Amino acid sequence: MKIILRADVENLGRLGDVVTVKPGFGRNYLLPQGLGMLASQANLKAFELERKKLQARMDALRNAAADIAAKLEGLVLAIPMRVGENDKLYGSVTTAIIGDGLAAQGIEVDRRRILLDSAIRALGEYPVRVRLHADVTAEILVKVVSEDKVNDVAESAPAEEPEAAAE
């Protein structure tokens, strides 16, 4: 089955490519999701008229992703986690936890865009890639720290502020 792609599809092709796919993939995924259309002569002509609109939309998405990547680049994200003996984490740091941490910083990123080779299971610093668009990737540094140390720092910081206010 020949399909004209109406958007970039990972591991398949880019906007405007005519690709051959298995009929089930085309009928059950590409066509219903609006990612492609059947490659007939009439659809090829209609697509050429629609191509500029789709390309403008894709460029706008790429530019928005580049703006978010500029905010993310060089960001150090501290993730407080409960630890047991020998600094072993209870559980692990997953993409959902990293996504929540970024949301707390005011940067909304879908957890599926965060690329982890495997879950983080120990304290330390880990470089994590965030794929915002097919062409735009940013790298952040995730620093996994003990929850106890974060609480100690949080308790000592407010204690110092009232003294400064009293002076």
Curated annotation (Swiss-Prot):
GO biological process: translation
Top-level taxon: Bacteria
Keyword Cytoplasm tagged: no
A cellular component term, taken from the record's GO annotations: ribonucleoprotein complex
Molecular-function annotations in GO: rRNA binding; structural constituent of ribosome
Keywords: Ribonucleoprotein, Ribosomal protein, RNA-binding, rRNA-binding
Role noted for this protein: Binds to the 23S rRNA.
Similarity section: Belongs to the bacterial ribosomal protein bL9 family.
HAMAP family: Ribosomal_bL9
Protein name per Swiss-Prot or TrEMBL: Large ribosomal subunit protein bL9
Organism: Nitratidesulfovibrio vulgaris (strain ATCC 29579 / DSM 644 / CCUG 34227 / NCIMB 8303 / VKM B-1760 / Hildenborough)
Gene that produces this protein: rplI
